[in-house]
Amino acid sequence: QSGIRRLIEFLTAHRLPPELAVRLYRVYGELATDALRDDPYLLTDEYYRADFSQVDAFAIALGVSADDERRVEAGILFELSYNLGAGHTFIPQDKLRTATCALLDLDGEMIDAGMLRLQEQGRMELSQIAGLTACYLPELYEAETYVCRRILSMADGEYPEPGRIDDLVAEIENRQGIDYAPEQRSAIRAAASRQLLIVTGGPGTGKTTV
């Protein structure tokens, strides 16, 4: 208990949330304070979810230089995680560079070097998409490529079109008291003959009825 108390006092003295102490102690035990002094940016890991600006101020107070490789890499990963919170699975490389430059107040060459290191460490993935270089967190790259493979696999096959599709549609119309438009009938026929179909259209165009 005394170890956690000292850790809480250390965190509080540096204006960091004391609730981080339990998770830190769970991982590092009595060596938690030493681990933080060695690499304050470990707090930006998903497990801790510490605020980047607080961690950055903490690191600078401990003597970490503005162009320290750990700071650069943590800033890049923060931007990737931040954009995930906004619903983006990747960021174009030029946008990631610009955002990280602004976050850390560093030039683009340092950010480029940091991105290269993260790639080599397997902590960031790059992919060419529609003429741009997309930057991913590794787990999101794996998830997105898996979804792509599944969609391609589903789209490759075709179900045989039921011979009575028009008769079945007529039965449904009579039973439910609806009258499908020609476009809706076409969508139903397409759905009956494919493993995968995407139905698009604005509000009130009949997607739900199909």
Residue ranges and their predicted role:
Residues Q1-V210:
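Conserved ATP-binding/catalytic motifs of P-loop helicase motor domains
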